[in-house]
Amino acid sequence: MRKIAIYGKGGIGKSTTTQNTVAGLVEMGRKVMVVGCDPKADSTRLLLHGLAQKTVLDTLRDEGEDVELEDVMKKGFKDTSCVESGGPEPGVGCAGRGIITSINLLEQLGAYDDDKQLDYVFYDVLGDVVCGGFAMPIRDGKAQEVYIVCSGEMMAMYAANNICKSIHKFGKVGDVRLGGLICNSRKVDNEANMIGEFAKKLGTQMIHFVPRDNMVQHAEINRKTVIDYAPDHSQADEYRTLASKIDNNTMMVIPNPLSIQELEDLLIGFGIMN
């Protein structure tokens, strides 16, 4: 079983990219569980066709300790297992702590047991804030592979570089490795070349460049992944390609994060900063 965490700055398209990639993997016959680690609890919406899923933390609050696996796990597109950790009430408590509680509960309830025959577990994690809780999937060995969703925008690259600092730190003492950057295009000038160069400087790869296409929004409005909503569209093939590249990826590295100066020099070199 491969345990993969998808990180990236808020609003970059992590949840969309994760769910569309998972749709590509299950279409290939892989058995996948998705664990949403974002307080917004929108990491499985497209796989579940918009059914609002009760989060692990809400279930624990309502039911106490007497929780069964089926109370927190729903079956989505092509039998994908879907879980949302959820978060505390706004302004109270720590969202990162919720992730820790959720993953521990899933382990106790046997979600990862051999009889589930999972090929993949995906953690979709809020990534601007690399606080202890959000870093938990990579800190405590819950995920061995990380993919960072970014774009050619300055803040997306800044967040990606910060996430690499975490992987660098925990990779030295554990098993976590960076599998690559996924560029979710924002149509920035020279974007593919810049993210390719950024990846090279980090010591990794841009595993795929996902072009911007309105079909993604059309599918989301219909509460589906592109592969589910428009399987013959070229954008569906982009996600199939990304899924296949992840499925075959063997390049796992401890990244070397850039200094702020190096990052700014890269942005200036590609004309993003003056």
Curated annotation (Swiss-Prot):
The modification ADP-ribosylarginine is found at residue 97. ATP binds at residues 8-15. The keyword Nucleotide-binding applies. One of its GO terms (biological process) is nitrogen fixation. The gene is nifH. Homodimer. Its EC number is 1.18.6.1. Transmembrane segments: none annotated. GO terms for molecular function: 4 iron, 4 sulfur cluster binding; ATP binding; metal ion binding; nitrogenase activity. Binds 1 [4Fe-4S] cluster per dimer. This is Nitrogenase iron protein. Belongs to the NifH/BchL/ChlL family. It comes from the Bacteria. The key enzymatic reactions in nitrogen fixation are catalyzed by the nitrogenase complex, which has 2 components: the iron protein and the molybdenum-iron protein. The lineage of its organism: Bacteria, Pseudomonadati, Bacteroidota, Bacteroidia, Bacteroidales. Pfam families: Fer4_NifH. Gene3D superfamilies: P-loop containing nucleotide triphosphate hydrolases. PROSITE patterns: NIFH_FRXC_1, NIFH_FRXC_2, NIFH_FRXC_3. The reversible ADP-ribosylation of Arg-97 inactivates the nitrogenase reductase and regulates nitrogenase activity. It catalyses: N2 + 8 reduced [2Fe-2S]-[ferredoxin] + 16 ATP + 16 H2O = H2 + 8 oxidized [2Fe-2S]-[ferredoxin] + 2 NH4(+) + 16 ADP + 16 phosphate + 6 H(+).
